[in-house]
């Protein structure tokens, strides 16, 4: 069900990474063996060539000299400034044509012609020409080294130039980003300054805690008056709806009664009913007008009171802003101290109550445990007395009493 747990081991040969590692090692070993075999074959070939050359020399052939000093022979050692010229040639600062085309230098180069590779095979000496000399000079390992050094130096210079250009481009980009950020912060600062000035104009400069408290109290009173007016208006509207509904019902009943009376016989009190209805309508309209006038007067009086209160609070705040700051601070500190003391007293009282409750609970639990312990001891003592009585009775019984008690059982067995 859980599979082979050996597959979870890093050394298990069935894992793909282990198989890949083994395959890579085998491939590397095979390539190494191939290279070793190639080197062995090359050495065998060189050994065979050397053996053939040795046999040729022993048969009377010319002895071949393994020399490479011709590569480092100086073309012109007579002049004292040859080292500077050769260094300039190797660094690519001077041309080699003027040095190689001189007759005397060509003759000096031809001194080692008899010891060249052609002399070993018994061939006539090879005359060195300009092309061979140029080929030998271009095959100079020191020249190749200097060329590589020069190429590395040029690549390093180009890389430093490219790095400097990238740094300059990065600095220009950072400068543009910095200017854009400064411009954005400046615009946002102007916007915040304008909004701050607008808020500063819309509110007062500085208000004392007393003025803020009066304003808050004034707003609460205004809210209470507004809610009271709304409740009065709703009550009046509800009364009007009830009155109109009752009036409609009364009119409907009256019309039904009048129609019934007309159908039966006209009565002389019809005018009195109409006059009474008109009087009721006039009384209702007069009452409603008086209520609306009282509500308008109360709202105008409240508005005047609110305006007067706001002016008085503003004047009081402007006159007592500097004088009442210290008094308000002292009063606030005193209130905080009193509140802290009151809370401390409440906490102490609560702690005392909790301690008394805890002691009472501990006493009750202790009494209950003591009572249970006494009951257990009593029960245990009664049981011990009963068992001790049984043991004592068994010890005091004689053989005759035991036989007498068991006689009935023996009689039953005999039957």
UniProtKB/Swiss-Prot annotation:
The keyword Nucleus applies. Residues 154-180, 209-260, 267-318, 355-383 have a biased composition (Basic and acidic residues). Associated with the spliceosome. Involved in pre-mRNA splicing. Belongs to the CWC25 family. It comes from the Eukaryota. Residues 194-208 have a biased composition (Basic residues). It is found in: Nucleus. InterPro entries: CIR_N_dom, CWC25, CWC25_splicing_factor. The lineage of its organism: Eukaryota, Fungi, Dikarya, Ascomycota, Pezizomycotina. It comes from Emericella nidulans (strain FGSC A4 / ATCC 38163 / CBS 112.46 / NRRL 194 / M139). This is Pre-mRNA-splicing factor cwc25. Residues 154-415 are annotated as: Disordered. One of its GO terms (biological process) is mRNA splicing, via spliceosome. Residues 15-59 form a coiled coil. Keywords: Coiled coil, mRNA processing, mRNA splicing, Nucleus, Spliceosome.
């Amino acid at each position: 069900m859980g599979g082979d747990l050996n597959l979870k081991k890093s050394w298990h040969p069935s894992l793909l990474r282990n198989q890949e590692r083994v395959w890579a090692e085998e491939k590397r070993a095979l390539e190494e063996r191939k290279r070793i075999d190639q080197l062995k074959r090359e050495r065998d070939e060189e050994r065979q060539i050397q053996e053939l050359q040795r046999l040729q020399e022993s048969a009377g052939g010319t002895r071949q000299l393994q020399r490479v000093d011709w590569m480092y022979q100086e073309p012109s050692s007579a002049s004292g400034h040859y080292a500077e010229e050769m260094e300039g040639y190797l660094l690519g600062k001077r041309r080699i044509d003027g040095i190689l085309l001189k007759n005397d230098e060509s003759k000096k180069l031809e001194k080692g012609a008899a010891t060249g590779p052609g002399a070993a095979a018994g061939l006539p000496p090879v005359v060195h020409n300009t092309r061979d000399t140029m080929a030998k000079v271009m095959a100079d390992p020191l020249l190749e080294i200097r060329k590589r050094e020069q190429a590395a130096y040029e690549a390093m210079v180009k890389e430093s130039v490219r790095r400097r250009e990238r740094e300059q481009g990065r600095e220009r980009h950072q400068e543009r980003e910095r200017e854009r950020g400064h411009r954005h912060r400046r615009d946002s600062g102007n916007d915040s300054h304008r909004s701050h000035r607008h808020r500063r104009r819309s509110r007062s400069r500085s208000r004392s805690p007393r003025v803020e408290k009066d304003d808050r109290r004034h707003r609460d009173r205004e809210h209470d008056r507004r809610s009271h007016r709304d409740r009065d208006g709703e009550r009046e509207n509800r009364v009007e709806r009830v009155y109109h509904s009752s009036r409609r019902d009364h009119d409907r009943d009256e019309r039904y009664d009048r129609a019934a009376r007309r159908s039966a016989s006209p009565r002389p009190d019809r005018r009195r009913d109409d006059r009474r209805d008109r009087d009721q309508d006039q009384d209702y309209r007069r009452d409603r007008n008086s209520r609306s006038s009282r509500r308008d007067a109360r709202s105008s009086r409240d508005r005047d009171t609110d305006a007067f209160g706001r002016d008085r609070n503003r004047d009081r705040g402007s006159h007592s802003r500097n004088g009442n700051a210290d008094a308000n601070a002292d009063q606030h500190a005193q209130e905080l101290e009193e509140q802290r003391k009151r809370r401390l007293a409440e906490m102490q009282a609560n702690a005392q109550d909790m301690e008394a409750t805890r002691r009472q609970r501990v006493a009750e639990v202790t009494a209950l445990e003591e009572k249970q312990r006494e009951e257990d001891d009593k029960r245990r003592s009664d049981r011990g007395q009963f068992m001790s009585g049984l043991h004592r009775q068994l010890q005091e019984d004689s053989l005759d009493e035991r036989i007498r008690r068991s006689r009935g059982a023996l009689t039953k067995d005999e039957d």
